[in-house]
Structures are given as C-alpha cells and as structure tokens.
Swiss-Prot record:
Function recorded in the entry: Catalyzes the attachment of isoleucine to tRNA(Ile). As IleRS can inadvertently accommodate and process structurally similar amino acids such as valine, to avoid such errors it has two additional distinct tRNA(Ile)-dependent editing activities. One activity is designated as 'pretransfer' editing and involves the hydrolysis of activated Val-AMP. The other activity is designated 'posttransfer' editing and involves deacylation of mischarged Val-tRNA(Ile).
Catalytic reaction equation(s): tRNA(Ile) + L-isoleucine + ATP = L-isoleucyl-tRNA(Ile) + AMP + diphosphate
Keywords for this protein: Aminoacyl-tRNA synthetase, ATP-binding, Cytoplasm, Ligase, Metal-binding, Nucleotide-binding, Protein biosynthesis, Zinc
Gene label: ileS
Species this protein is from: Prochlorococcus marinus (strain MIT 9312)
Protein's name according to its UniProt entry: Isoleucine--tRNA ligase
Domain of life (superkingdom): Bacteria
Localization of this protein: Cytoplasm
Residues at which L-isoleucyl-5'-AMP binds: 582
Self-association and partners: Monomer.
Amino acid sequence: MKSQNNKEYKSEFSYKETLNLLKTDFSMRANSVLREPEIQNFWAKNNIDFELGSNNSGKIFTLHDGPPYANGALHMGHALNKVLKDIINKYKTLRGFRVHYVPGWDCHGLPIELKVLQNLKSSERKNLDTLNLRKKATDYAYVQINNQMEGFKRWGIWGNWDNPYLTLKKSYESAQIGVFGKMFLNGYIYRGLKPVHWSPSSRTALAEAELEYPDEHYSKSIYVSLKITKLSDEILLKFYQENPNFKKDFFLSNSFITIWTTTPWTIPANEAVAVNPKINYVFAIDEEKRIYLLAKELSSEISNKFNKDLTTLLEVKGVTLEDIEYQHPTKNKNCRIVIGGDYITIESGTGIVHTAPGHGIDDFNVGRKYDLPTTCVVDEKGNLNEYSGQFQGSNVLKDANDLIIDYLEEKDLLLLQENYKHRYPYDWRTKKPTIFRATEQWFASVNGFRSSALKAIEDVEWIPATGKKRIYSMVVGRGDWCISRQRSWGLPIPVFYKKNGNEILLNSEIINHIQKLFSEHGADIWWDWDVKHLLPDNYVKESDLWKKGTDTMDVWFDSGSSWAAVCEQRSELKYPADLYLEGSDQHRGWFQSSLLTSVAVNNKPPYKKVLTHGFALDENGRKMSKSLGNVVDPNIIINGGNNKKIEPAYGADVLRLWVSSVDYSVDVPIGSNILKQLSDVYRKVRNTARYLLGNIHDYDPNIDSFEIDQLPLLDQWMLGRLVEVTDQISNAYENYEFSKFFQILQSFCVVDLSNFYLDIAKDRLYVSSKSQFRRRSCQFVMSKVVENLAVLISPVLCHMAEDIWQNVPYSTKEKSVFQRGWPNFSQSWKNEILNEHIANLRNLRVEINKAIEGCRNKQIIGAALETEVNYLPKDKVVKDSLTWLKKFGNEEVDLFRDWLIVSNFQVVSELAKNSLIIDNNEIGKIQILKAHGQKCDRCWHYQEEIFSGIQNTKLCKRCSHIINLEFT
C-alpha cells in the first residue's frame, strides 16, 4: 500500500467513496400527485393501455362492466368495484389474453329526470315538454359521465374510454328493443292489471331492485273487528252442541272476525279476509259477551294486548271457515272469508288477513282465485280516490291512516292501535315509502322461463359460492317483473293502443320497424314523430286509429340488456361474458335482470362466472353517510384534503392497494388509520424496489448472467423463492384472491428480501470490488427480482410498477412493464432440499438475532459486527444444515457468519468463558461474545489480522486488498 503521505491520499479521503453505494433516480418518495399522471401520460402516448390487451394473440377474455349510474360523484364503492375489475384485466393482459374492457353507464331513469327538474325554475318546468326534458337529461348525463370517467382514469383504470357503452346511445336502444321484442314474441311479456310497488313521491311503478328497506320504519298497525253476518250451518250446529246454554241467535249476533293490518288506508279496498286452511281457529268470548274469531295460537297474546279475558267456546280448522260473511267496515256490503295460503302465519297479527286485491300480491292472487274485484282506491299521487268513499282526497302517506282509524274507532270496530317496527319498502331515490297499487302495467312473465333461469344459475360459477344460493332463492320466489314505468326519461315501450277500445298493436313487424328507426334516429322520435311516421308502411292507412304508448322501460331492463347491446354487438368481446363483477346487491339487480333477459331470449346465462363484493364501510364498520361525517372520499385519498397533515395525498396506488388488501367478499372498512397502515406497506414495497434498483446501477445482464448452478446457495435459494412467490401470486390472481397477493407481497418484501436476503447482501454489494463474483452474482439475482417484482405488482400497483420499470438502469426489450408478459420461470429453479436447509438456518438466525438484540437492549454492544457467536447444537436437523452449508456453500457468500452479519461464528462442543449473553433454547445454546481483533474502518468487521490504512485507519485483509487493487 502506498504511504499515507502520498499526495494521492488527501486527509479528507473517506472510505465511503470506495464503497459501491446505492445509485438510482427512483425516488424514496412516490410524489404520486405528480408522478402518477406522468406515468398515465406515458401510457397514453405509447398506447400502453387497453389496446395492449386488444392486440394480444391469446383467447378473448371479457369482463363485462356493470354500468354505474350517470349521476353524482364517485365514492368508495365505485373504487372497490372498478379497481377489482382493473386488477383482473391487467393480469389477464399480462397473461396474453385479448382483453378489451368496455366501460358503461346507465343513463336513463328517475334520478336524472329529477335532477333536471330541480335545476329549472317553476315557470320553466311548467313549459317543459317531453322532448326538451329528454334533451336536458341527455346533456346532464353526458356531463356526469365525463366527470366520472376522469375519476376512473385517475385511478389508473384502463378501458375503451373513447367508445364506452351508454344506455342512451342509439345502437344500445335499438338492441334493447330487440331484446324486448324477442321476449314479447316468445310469449314472455304481457300487459295486465296487477298490484305493483308504486312510489307516490315519484309517481311511477318500481321494481324490487329499486327499493330499499330502512332499519327504523314504524307503521300504524290496527286490530279491527268485523261483524259476522252469516255463519255456515256446520259451524252453528257444532257451536250449540258444545255450548247448549246460549240462546239460538246469540252466536251470530255477537260474533266478530278479528283482523290486523299495518296499512289502515287499505281498509276501504277490503274485498275479503283470508284464513290458512291448516291453522286452528277459535271463537273466544270476552266479559262483554263479544265473540272473536282468531287463530288459537295467538289467543293468549291477543288477550293480553286487548286486556280482555278470552274464553274459548269453539275450535275449528281454517278450512271450515270458508264463505262466512261479514259486514264491510266502511261500505254497505257483505264480504266473505276465503282460503289463503302459507303467507298466513301465527307469527303476528290474528291469523286472519285483511285482503285488498288491488293493494297486495298475495291478496291479488287470492282475489283471482275467488274472482274478487281488483279495486284500487289510490291514484298515482297516493291520494285516495272515489272508490274509497268518504276518505277521497286524503293521502296514504299523510292523513289517510288517521282518518280511517278515527272512523273505525267511532264505529266501535277498532280494538287496538300500536306502532309496529318492520321492514318496509322505500323508493331508493326519493327515500320515501312506497305502496302496493294495482295499475295496468307491462310485465315479464318469469313463470314462463323460471325453470330455465334456475338451470342457468346452476351452470354459472358464483364467487363466493354463497351467491348462487342467494340468487337462486330470489329467482325461485320472485313474481312477474314489472318492466313499465310512467316517466319520460327512458326507452319507450314500442306499443300502439287503439284509440277506441283495449286493443294493442305490437308484433314482429312493428318491433323490427321501431328497432330500425331507433338505430338510425334514436328513441326521441317516439315523442317527436306522429304515429303514421312510426308505423310500417302497410299500417299507415290506419294510423288515425292508433295512439302511442307513454310508458318507458324499467332501467333494470335497460342495463339487463347490455349483453345484447354490447357483448353480442362488439366483435372484440364475447357472449356469454367470462365474468360479471359487481356488489352483492346486484343479485337482485343487474345480475338477475341480465340473467332473466338472456335466458328468455337465448336460453342461456349471459355470464360464465359472477364475482360479488361487499360494501365500503368506515373503520368502525358503519355505513358511510354525510350525517355521520364518516364519508371517505377516494379523490381525497389520492390528492389529499385541504389540510395535508390530516388528509395526506396517498395517490391512486394506495387506493388500489387497499382494494387488494381486503376480503372483498364481505363489507370492507376504510379510514385514516387503515390508510396509514397501507401507506406503510406501500412504502416498504417501494423502498425494497429502490434498494434493488440502486444496487444494480452498474450491472449489465448482457455481460454478467449466470446459470443457477453457478450461483452461491443463498442466491439459488433466492431465485427459487422468487419462483415460489410468482406461483403463489399467480394463483392468487387466477382465483381472484387478491388479499393473498397482498399478504404474499408483504411477506416477500419484508421477510424474504429486506430482513434476510438484502440484509445479508449489504456486505457483498457495498464492500466487494465492483466486478467481483460475489457482487455480480448478487446483482444478477437482484435484477431478476426487481424486474419480476415490477410485473407481479403491476395489476395492483400499476403506477409504481411502471415507475420501477422506467428506472431499470440497463436497456430492456420492453418499453413498459405491461409489455413484458407474465413471468415464466423454470420450475427447476425450485429446490426442496435447499429450501429445507435454508429454512432451518433462518430459524437459527432468528434465535441468534434475538440474543444479539438482547445485548443491544442492554447497551453492551452497538452493531452486530461487534460480536461473535458460538453455537452448541441440540437439534440435529440444524446441525446437519450447518454442515451442508459448509460443505456446499460458496466461501465468499455462504459463510453463516456473513448471514448473521457478525464477525465470527463457530459450532462448538462447549461454550467459551466471558459471554455477553447465553440463550438456551430448543435448538441449542447460543453464546454471544465480544468480537476478537480490531474493527476494519471500511467494512466494520472485526479481524485478528489488521493492516494500516489511510491516516492511521485500520483495514482487514480483504479491504486492504481492494483498496490496493482499485484505488492505488
């Protein structure tokens, strides 16, 4: 070595300058607010987006987008849904599938119509015709679509944003008319009078999927007595046989039917009362000599409710009560008892059901059986009409209940009134109660194809499997689907009605003609053109006889036709789609409407697999609401809030990481604490990548590449572990188990890389000479790890993955990480014997590190290199692994001393004296001693043999050699 007086060595010379330190432009901080949009611009500029998947040569993979509603700001539910879809699409793209994701929007319906009306002055509303309303609704929908689209793009979602599908587009409307037409021609669509869910606040019929059931709904329930006017001879005879002391007319004169209802306003619509033929009923008398007919099992409960002592006089089966007559409570007519079904139970009420066929499905079905009138006593606003008699003009949601209750009390028919908490349907848009109301509507007859729909459900893979049972039970039990709506903003039902009479004009010729017109001109012509211009030529002469229908289609029929309007129409997609993916509420919504239309038209399901996710809740498991102040805004997660200390900008990748971290099959929490934890995980992955990139800055794979058997054992293990992790992550993606990806990624980056391989590698990387095998072999492994880590995380952490790829310091064939394709390693890289030995040695390393940490905590030592370790084995397995390592390991890399990052390690038969600490455990005795020798000022190892360095510094033999070789 040259003397320290040599002018080449200046006093300020630092050994730091002789180390191979980390060098990379990949920053420690993500700076996501700026960097992520830059990456997205890079993708756009280089067509690194959905077109990548479109240009792949593999099989078509179609994830068909369930259309979000084109109204309102994006929320965490959107984020969960769209990111899940994007993870799958990006993974499939990397796997070589032809992926063409077409995002869609649901554009018709009441919310948009109401928004348009709310934005107008009252004078403007009065003068607004249907065409202008539809024009304004179209404009409003496009504004909302553009706003939501920008949000989706910012999340890193890839899709055909230039040509999404919109239910308001001409091509879509035309295809939907085709679905309607085929269902009609197959005999599955009919028009009829039937009770439907009716929203007085919206003035339209609603489908089941448009309802919600608030937790805190109370109805005014009443118990009512109805005077019996006629009993059967059989019951009269039996009564007097069992009660001979009563006078001849006493029984009939004093007997009342007892009913219970939660809708007092329907009392004027009463046409019968229904009993269950299998239930036992009693005639029970009170102290005032009034006799009540009610279910036997409820007699005691009702006795307590009425505060009356009831004594049973006669017990009969429900089937014997048929045709008993009673006085209608509000009208001058007699009604009768009819036989109902299993919907009549003894769980509540009296076991006898007030029956108003115009205001309930069960009532309607019983009414058809007995040819009862389907009387509707309510108009479209919820006001009682002329059929209600003296109650006309009162409103079912306001004063009608009280008026009728007062009337019943005045007539001495009211037995009890009480508030009753139960599930009650509300209009999901206006948040106000709905009612059942019989109106002329268009229906899809599910009975006509129910068995085919149930078979189709069996043919689909449901993820999670519970989804199958859920939708199956819904389809088994559902009634006919009301598909007509009394609103302007929707697709018209293409039917013509005879001006004089009930005849309708709807056939294949009409349907095909309207479908063609809508395809060319759009659905607005239904309101703009005269009947003669809408009819086919051979009907024009009789156009004066017909008028256009005014009903529009249920929005669930709109979105439920998307398989026909999108998957069947676009050559880059396929039908049935490979996957539908939406929230669990869509079992009764889009999944079901799509299934029903597809089965009705083509006798097959529109999807092969259906995956459902839960809802996003706050950290305490509560539903998010503005009133609770617990709404988490995805935009604030990405860009930060007004106070960045409280609401920092995490970027889209942390949002995406959250999606991958949760068990999406159930409701999932999100909040500030969870985001902080995810940010820490994100940072660990990023720092791991940075360390890998920074240490291959001078590596060239074209010069320094190795076969696996040329590598040290530690490197062979690392590559084998990379293959295992790739297989595990691949399986997680394949099975849509993204939380497993999250767990595997964390463990790989923290446990396998940071805490083990990279921790050990520091000496190899920093201290070795630049081109030394022990360094280049490590760089070779690190290059493999960082390249493939970027690919493995890219479906989830797409921006970070691209950032990593752009900072790989040597040239790569692929411009983008997404052009790389999915890793395809040789399985020969996996070595079970190697894994077993390394696992044993890692366990020993953990125990030794605990002992060293004990010394550090006692402030006996600082760095682990200040120690040496003696190990007295108890465990033969561990001892054999140490022997194996010594026999087969590379002397420059695989010394267990270097794996421990201590200055010396020995397997001993007895322990030395002067221990810092001794740990006696299952695998043996671990003795920590002060390291012998002196500290090398360059590598910090303690060695017995020390050489003089620069300016009185000390160097070990290895470092002295490197300094002499490379710096003299």
